[in-house]
Amino acid sequence: MCGILGCINFKFVPGSLDSISHRGPDGSGVKNFKINSHDVTLAHRRLSIVDVSENGAQPMASGDGNSFITFNGEIYNHDTLKPKMKFTQFKGHSDTETLVNYFNEHTISDLKDLNGIFGFAILDQAKKRLYVARDRFGVKPIYYYFKNNQLVFSSEVRPFKHYIDMVYDRENVTEGLKMRYVGAPDTIFTDIKKIEAGQVLTFDLSQEEIVLTKEYYIKTPKMGSRKQESASLVKEYGQLFEQAVERQLMSDVEIGVLLSGGIDSALVAAVAKNKSAKPLKTFTVGFKEGLFASDEIEMAKVTAETLKLENIAVRTDFVDFIEDLKKIIRIVEEPIATNSIIPMYSLSKLTAEHVKVVLSGQGADEPLYGYRKYKGLIFLKHLERFSFLRKGLKLTGMKSMKKEDVRRFYDAAVETDMLTAYREYNSISSGNELGKLLNKTGLADTDTILKRKQGLFKEKWNARIPSDKAIISFPFLDLRNSLADDLLMYTDKLMMHFSVECRVPILDNDLIEFIESLHHSYKLSFSKGKIIHKQFAEEYLPASIVHRKKIGFATPASKWYKTHKQLIEDIICSSKEIGKIFNINAIKEVLNTHEQNQNGEKQILLLLSLALLME
């Protein structure tokens, strides 16, 4: 796991690579090329995990010297790619060497063969093309700027300030407050984009004018139709889960496991222990004792003791909440509305004191219907089938109810367009709320922005959604949108800030393809989620852990916001950039009434993170 950087037709600035040194403290490299009239630079910061010798240093050349790569990530199946190659003279055993030689012989369409997490750039000198690609679920981020025949790309945003003026985009900021994150390809900056999950960008350098083409290298899977005898499916699920964890134990350095009080990380830890020849440490974060009815650390401790694994925990209270949040937001570089980012910072710091690599249980809730909100999809299924029910719902008056999850369900339920319904189902701010918050033309301006963003979302997904049924497509979209651009994004940034690689076994290609092929009844009922997941988990874990009530990661956010209310208001309302976009009086109303709004805390954190980013 590393940091990558590159540019075309810019003079390379060494300080830009230094700005991501935390992603790769074990080494660095820069290579310059001349392709026709274009000046190309590939740069790299290295975190040594597989083949820690100099044979793994980057940028790395293919055996014949034609292709060069700068690579961030892991290819877990790289050994299975070697028999498909003519090249055999490997200097080491790194997946980077496999990758650069594989694509020196194969086409970029063969990206679908890679099972791993990655963001990389490959320069093919013979073809005069630069390829920049991101893994299919977006575990590893890549940002880029392409304008006026110039390109910059990087694992993080901070290098861009060495090359371009960074201008905030009002519409993208508004979108963040609507959806709680800014989804790829957009960022809060006008000219900086994110490569989308499962996307490859090709820059053709054969002519004076660089030509960019974008394509998705993964076809939409067949989803939600597979049915057969339950026991055989549980067995197959278990085999794929075990295979996924075993693959991701690939490392020449010590590996640990992030352990919460939930089933997902517990199952990953249990299988990892079973498959690993080396002892594993587990890591947990929690808050001061007595703060919540349930204690994350105590629950994780029970799991670790059951599995006979060492557990290292840290308790935090974030007394200096604002100062800590300033550090966190500068690391993450994007606006955030998820309070769990705050304890994740402490967990990342703790983990770095012991290991370079950790496995996490992230990625289960979306494909396996683990979130409470997915129960509502069962009702939406009936509304889609019987249109008169949707018409009747419009007459109920539910729209006027103050409970936010009811409002979101209503907005989605009465919407006949599935992609529009998806956005409403996942929003943290209604159109009316945004209309009040935006300055200048208010509601009319908001309506224009939201319609434009909705149109772009449809353009992105219309041809790729697997079904017009919400119960199939909503989890599919969550996995490739909110998971990639929110949870996975900030986990990568925080872990890599402390030079730790975080792996996600549940997002293994083969495992997800199997999960998504299943009929939803194997995953969700009115009373249960993750059904097949829990059935397999019973082979490794006691029922008390498998069926422990899902509580999510609780944070004392309400206490933080009360304690620091005036300081938060001062930070947000004194921001000149915030004042250009939002109505300050409306922001003060959000701050004063957040306890009556189910999404009030998310809105405050989003606005606060924006203000801190814009300082």
Which residue stretches match the model-derived regions?
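Cysteine-centered catalytic environments shared across enzyme families
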Residues: 1-332, 344, 348, 538-539, ...
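Short amphipathic alpha-helical segments and their helix-coil junctions
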Residues: 81-85, 453-470, 516, 580-597
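Phosphate/pyrophosphate-binding loops and the adjoining catalytic core of nucleotide-dependent enzymes
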Residues: 483
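PAPS-dependent sulfotransferase catalytic core
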Residues: 541-597
